[in-house]
Amino acid sequence: MALIKKFRIKSFKVDETIVELKNISFFYNKRQILNNLNLKIKKQEILGMLGPNGVGKSTIFNLITGLKDPNYGEIIINGINCTNLPINERFTKFKLGLVPQYGGLIHDLTLLDNLKLVSEIHIKEREL
């Protein structure tokens, strides 16, 4: 079982839910990874998940971003059910981002600088 820990970035309370997983179940090769998971992520929260391999940590992120689809349940982002939205719509419509566990980062830059670099490249492409 994964341990899910939430932190708030600021000290004041914000109740606006931006991501909600409702009754999510997910199977991988007939093995149930998630069973009726319910999770709310509110604005200005940082979510950390700890646990051994195979308990669903990466699967949760893959479900939120649309890299995987749940077998059962709903994924709500900013109040919109996006369970069946294609991945490209989910990333562009909701401005989702994902930092890979391995690779994909320039090691000499901080995480913030890596994110800034990607956003600058994306903005420049749109301006062309």
Placement of each model-derived feature along the sequence:
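Conserved ABC transporter NBD signature motif
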Residues: 73-82, 91-93, 127-128
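ABC ATPase NBD coupling module
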Residues: 81-97, 102, 121
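Q-loop/switch helix immediately C-terminal to the Walker
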Residues: 102, 108-121
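The feature captures the beta-strand-to-loop junction immediately N-terminal to the Walker
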Residues: 50-52
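Helix-to-loop junction immediately C-terminal to a conserved catalytic motif
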Residues: 65
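Conserved Walker
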Residues: 58-59
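Conserved structural motif at the start of ABC-family nucleotide-binding domains
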Residues: 19-21, 34
